[in-house]
Structures are given as structure tokens and as C-alpha cells.
């Protein structure tokens, strides 16, 4: 595939595809995670199975297993094998610390879960510093419905990650993506929402034609995306509670690549209503447009700097797709990518330090990371035909679409490149990922 063909896929999809939208409900199909590589330098941590007193009525979720999987996926921590745990304590006074020090782990998680009279669950957890022989975190949750047990496990994972790294965890967050399946020989597309680990997948719309470019609002309550339900590209705004859906851009020509401003007051768009494909900003309260770029080249895939003062976007104004930065106060436009003949799909880390992008090279199209402080540029992946990088809200991971064995899947790579994971569905292909914000 040539560089130009890769670049033109976006425009081609916008121009020629049609879209048919309908609500639907189907059995959920969670993403399956395969961890390709784990760091040998990961810190061991003991995650003790939570105490459960009734062997004949086990809770529907194994909290310790979920928490261990969360921390393992970070690449920073390695849960000790369950078979090697010297005991199953659930209280501080039950811990024989010499046994745990011999295990080589400095920290351990213990806890209990009980079913109450309402049929819900009471949970207690304690995070222990083994060397100091003291509890550093202790918390209880009461009357938790079964459907929220996984969420409690992710909250515990976030607490442990913050305690151990000083960085807020991002396990209790959501991701959006598009799944493509074959139904009666025809392609069917669905926009789905899932937990950050791919579980609890919920489709929010279904189409016989592609769905593109989902973008989360900063409060995590709405998605903007591109649809073709009326035979042309249109940008749709939809609330995740199902109460609101409306078309917000249906101009002549291309309507694509929506991206929310950090304060949620504006949406950056790619429009060709004035001839060429350029970047515009829509005021979400008034609907008024502000044109940011004026160039005959294709200008698209914009994303906001965290301070809201500039936009990063993809343009072939220099003959090949590269990443540029437009400063909204001065109008200055500056090229920022110089390594390689092809760079597209910019995504900015939450702290504004890094720009992830797709770099075209002899090995295909890979996720690359540009450090705006040092200008260090490095390839992050060894996969093929990567697309749509998206940072986790804590900036520690990058979610992206890739191709493996001829099938589109999602993958996650840690910012330090110590671990990668592949997320796939058994009955389809997954693409166009977008990592949502913190929910509280």
C-alpha cells in the first residue's frame, strides 16, 4: 500500500460510503485480551484472593483476579502466582510477615466479600506494606449490586496504582470503538462502549455502513462521531444515556473527524464546504463556525492541546502527510513532525508532553511518539497498519487499531513500551478506538 493510498482512505470513506442507523440490543461481546509482552523488570505484588465464606454460592466476579489482571497490564507490576502465596489472610492480624517477605514482594492486597440480606455485596480491602508491616490503604464498600463488582475492582486497582506510582490509575474508565461483523454475508458495523479492559461491552448503535471517528466529550457523557445515514457524511452528537441524538454538521462535502475541546465548549471538525478539506471549530452552544486553516491540501484529524490553546492536525500541504500545530490566539501554524515521509493521526498526551502519531516506514504504519520537550522520536509498535492512537486519561498507555493476521484489532502499548496487549472479538474486527476520560 502506498503512502498516498493510506492517506486517502479517510477521504474516500467520507465521500463514497452511505450509512443506515438504527438502535439495537444484542448480547454483549467482550473484547478478549492477549498480552504480547510483559516487562521482566515489573515489581512483584501479592494479590490474595478475597475471603468468601460460602463455597456453594461464589460471587459472580473474582475481584482479586480482576485487580491482578489490571496491574499486570500496566507492565509495571507482576502479580505473584496464586499457587506461590504462602497463605490466604483476610485480616491484618492474620498475616505472618516473615513468610511474605520471603516471597520477594513488598506489598500485598487482602480483602473479603460477603453477600448481604438484600442480595448485594459488602466488600472490604486492605493494602499492606510488607516491609513496614502496616496497612497503607483500607476501605469498605457496602450493598454493591453484582453488576458493579467489576467497577469496584477497577477502583481498587486505581487506588493501588496511585499508591505505588504516584500517578492516578485509569482502570475505571471506558473505551469506545467500532466492531465490523459479517451478518448474512454483509458487513454490519456497531459503535460499542466497554470498560478499559474490554469487559462489559455495550453496543450503542448499529449500521449496515461504516461508523467513523468516535470522540468522547470531556465529561464522558456524550460521543461525537461521523455517520452516513442520509447518504452523505454527517457529524452526530449522542448522549450515552440514550436520551439525546442529533446531527450537528451536515454541510456540503466532507463532515468529519470531530474532536472535543478540553472544556467541552467547542468541537474541532474537518469540513470541505468551502472547497478544500480544512479545520474548523464549532461553538457547541451557538453552532457558529470558526475556520482555522485555509489551504488547498487535505487538513484533517485535528486534536486539541490540553490547554485548549492550539490544535494538532494532519496535512499534506508539504506534499506528504505531516503533523502541524495551529495556535488559536495568533493564527501561527507550525510543522512538528520531521522524521519520516508520512505522519498522521495525531493524539496529544494529557500533560501535553507527547504527540502520538502514525508513522509510515519500511515496515508499514506504526505508532510513533514525539516528545515535544526533547524532540525525541521513537517507534512504539511492531504491528502493521496501525491507526487511531488514543492516550489513556493518565497518559500511561496508548490505545490504537492494528492489523494482526489479516484482521483488524485493537492494541494497547504502555508509554514506556514495557508491555503491549491485543484486544479482539471472536466474531469480528475492531477499529477506530477512543479512550474515554475519567468518570469522576
Regions found by a protein language model. Give the residues of each.
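Residue-level detector of Asp-centered blade-edge/turn motifs that repeat once per structural unit
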Residues: 169-171, 218-219, 262-263, 306-307, ...
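Hydrophobic beta-strand positions that form the internal "hydrophobic ladder"
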Residues: 175, 223, 264-268, 308-312, ...
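Multi-bladed beta-propeller domains
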Residues: 195-210, 238-256, 282-300, 326-342, ...
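Structural motif
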Residues: 119-122, 184-192, 232-236, 276-280, ...
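Amphipathic beta-strand/beta-sheet edge segments enriched in Tyr/Trp
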Residues: 31, 92-159
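Short beta-strand->alpha-helix linker/helix-N-cap micro-motif
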Residues: 32-98, 109, 113
Amino acid at each position: 500500500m502506498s503512502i498516498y493510498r493510506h492517506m486517502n482512505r479517510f477521504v474516500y470513506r467520507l465521500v463514497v460510503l452511505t450509512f443506515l442507523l438504527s438502535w439495537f440490543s444484542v448480547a454483549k461481546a467482550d473484547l478478549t485480551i492477549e498480552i504480547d509482552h510483559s516487562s521482566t523488570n515489573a515489581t512483584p505484588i501479592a494479590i490474595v484472593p478475597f475471603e468468601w465464606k460460602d463455597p456453594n454460592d461464589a460471587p459472580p466476579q473474582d475481584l482479586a483476579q480482576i485487580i491482578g489482571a489490571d496491574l499486570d497490564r500496566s507492565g509495571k507490576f507482576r502479580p505473584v502466582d496464586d499457587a506461590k502465596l504462602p497463605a490466604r489472610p483476610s485480616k491484618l492480624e492474620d498475616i505472618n510477615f516473615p513468610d511474605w517477605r520471603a516471597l520477594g514482594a513488598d506489598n500485598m492486597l487482602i480483602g473479603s466479600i460477603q453477600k448481604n440480606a438484600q442480595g448485594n455485596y459488602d466488600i472490604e480491602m486492605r493494602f499492606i506494606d510488607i516491609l513496614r508491616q502496616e496497612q497503607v490503604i483500607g476501605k469498605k464498600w457496602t450493598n454493591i449490586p453484582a453488576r458493579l463488582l467489576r467497577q469496584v475492582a477497577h477502583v481498587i486497582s486505581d487506588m493501588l496504582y496511585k499508591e505505588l506510582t504516584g500517578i492516578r490509575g485509569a482502570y475505571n474508565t471506558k473505551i469506545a470503538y467500532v466492531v465490523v461483523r459479517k451478518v448474512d454475508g454483509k458487513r454490519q458495523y456497531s459503535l460499542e462502549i466497554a470498560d478499559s479492559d474490554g469487559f462489559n461491552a455495550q453496543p450503542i448503535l448499529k449500521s449496515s455502513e461504516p461508523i467513523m471517528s468516535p470522540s468522547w466529550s470531556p465529561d464522558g457523557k456524550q460521543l461525537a462521531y461521523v455517520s452516513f445515514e442520509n447518504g452523505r457524511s454527517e457529524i452526530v452528537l449522542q448522549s450515552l444515556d440514550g436520551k439525546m441524538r442529533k446531527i450537528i454538521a451536515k454541510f456540503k462535502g466532507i463532515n468529519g473527524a470531530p474532536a472535543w475541546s478540553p472544556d467541552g465548549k467547542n468541537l474541532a471538525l474537518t469540513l470541505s464546504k468551502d472547497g478544500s478539506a480544512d479545520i474548523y471549530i464549532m461553538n457547541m452552544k451557538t453552532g457558529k463556525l470558526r475556520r482555522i486553516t485555509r489551504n488547498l491540501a487535505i487538513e484533517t484529524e485535528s486534536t486539541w492541546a490540553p490547554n485548549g490553546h492550539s490544535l494538532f492536525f494532519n496535512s499534506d500541504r508539504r506534499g506528504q502527510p505531516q503533523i502541524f500545530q495551529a495556535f488559536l490566539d495568533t493564527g501561527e501554524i507550525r510543522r512538528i513532525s520531521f522524521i519520516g515521509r508520512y505522519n498522521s493521526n495525531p493524539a496529544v498526551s494529557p500533560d501535553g508532553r507527547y504527540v502520538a502519531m502514525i508513522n509510515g516506514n519500511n515496515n508499514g504504519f506504526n505508532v510513533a511518539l514525539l516528545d515535544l520537550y526533547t524532540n525525541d522520536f521513537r517507534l512504539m509498535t511492531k504491528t502493521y497498519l496501525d491507526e487511531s492512537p488514543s492516550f489513556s486519561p493518565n497518559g500511561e498507555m496508548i490505545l490504537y487499531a492494528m492489523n494482526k493476521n489479516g484482521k483488524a484489532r485493537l492494541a494497547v502499548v504502555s508509554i514506556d513500551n514495557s508491555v503491549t496487549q491485543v484486544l479482539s472479538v471472536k466474531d469480528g474486527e475492531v477499529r477506530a478506538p477512543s479512550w474515554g476520560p475519567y468518570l469522576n
